[in-house]
Amino acid sequence: MAPEDRRRQILAGAVSYFAEVGLSGNTRDLSQRLGVTQSLIFKHFPTKTALQEAVYEQVFLSRIEPHWPALIRDRSRPLLARLEQFYTEYTRAIFTYEWMRIFMFSGLEGAELNRRYLGHLQQVILSPMLEELNAAIAPEVAGPEDIWRLHGSIIYIGIRRFVYQTPTP
């Protein structure tokens, strides 16, 4: 198998594995699951941290669409239409078994991955969303916690679906 194909195969397996067992899962068990040696994993990812970084990039960062900040700031459209479009696209991107479970495990295990993701999301999406909300209604009416409540209520639908495995809209 070509090295890039093998790397993709290991990364896909790691995403599935970490979604099932959490980021504390070990590379020995991962290698057994994939039917490869640990040394092959470390050939493509020199450390477990490097593997987790690749998982973070694939599962979290690669799903943030570059047009979302402009969409949120496009005042030629009503704010409600912008928010509906953003959250339709965003939930389509993140409402997956892997995203939700890795995100939850990362938080429970105290990993830095979701703190970094949330910091990035706040800078790129949520802070501009707050600015637009205040521009649409009245300056300083909404605060950061209002945006987090909005965002959190939508994310909670995914948590119910993929973590609690309960019916959702």
List where the protein language model places each region.
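Amphipathic alpha-helical interaction segments
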Residues: Q9, A50, Q85, I102, ...
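Helix-turn-helix
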Residues: Q9, G13, Y17-A50, A54
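Amphipathic alpha-helical linker/stalk segments
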Residues: E53-Q85, E131
